[in-house]
Amino acid sequence: MKSLLREMTDTDLQRCLEKIRNKQYTFIAAGDNGKVYQIDGEDKVFKITGDRDEYEIAEILVDRANEFTTFIPVYYVDGNNMYIVANADTLPAGLKKEIDMFMDDFAFFSRDEGGEVSIFDFLPDAGELNPQIENFLTALQTDIEKLGVSEFDLDFDFRSDNIMMLNGKMVMVDW
């Protein structure tokens, strides 16, 4: 049953693509490199990104939600700059605050280490973390290693604004 929730049928995909072609969507957010739109009447959104590296990661993730559980499920990539993903919920304020504090501490750690360190290098020195955040970071590290993208752990955009909730679990929605 879990895998069915993470998959998208061809019929669902075609319906979403038709709605995108017919401009049946609503703008919901913009970030540094792109814009996100809610597809009318669907629990899916699509993103148009100007960041080639971000798009290349989406290409790796497409139809692999069961393998990469810490990333938002990617259902479709268009071969250019658009991809369709699940619609997720906002990160609760308490988790957002704890992740922001973790990142503030990481910034000090990074400076002390002279840069070129990842959040995973910091994890053993982070002190006591919320178990939900610690478990997410451990699983995220495993997923990033499975991606096989050289130095992605140093380059990905880990911050609370890029994490949302899907089915009660944290997922990266931007990277």
Protein language model features and the residues they cover:
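Non-catalytic localization/regulatory regions flanking kinase domains
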Residues: 1, 69-70, 171
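Juxta-kinase regulatory segment immediately upstream of eukaryotic protein kinase catalytic domains
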Residues: 1-25, 128
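ATP-binding glycine-rich loop module of kinase domains
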Residues: 24-83
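Residue-level recognition of conserved beta-strand positions in structured domain cores
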Residues: 48-50, 86-87, 174-175
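Short catalytic/ligand-binding loop motif for oxyanion handling, primarily in non-cytosolic enzymes
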Residues: 54-56, 92-96, 167
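Conserved structural core of kinase catalytic domains
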Residues: 68-138
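ATP/nucleotide-binding catalytic cores
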Residues: 132-157
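Catalytic activation segment of kinase domains across protein kinase-like and atypical kinase folds
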Residues: 148, 152-175
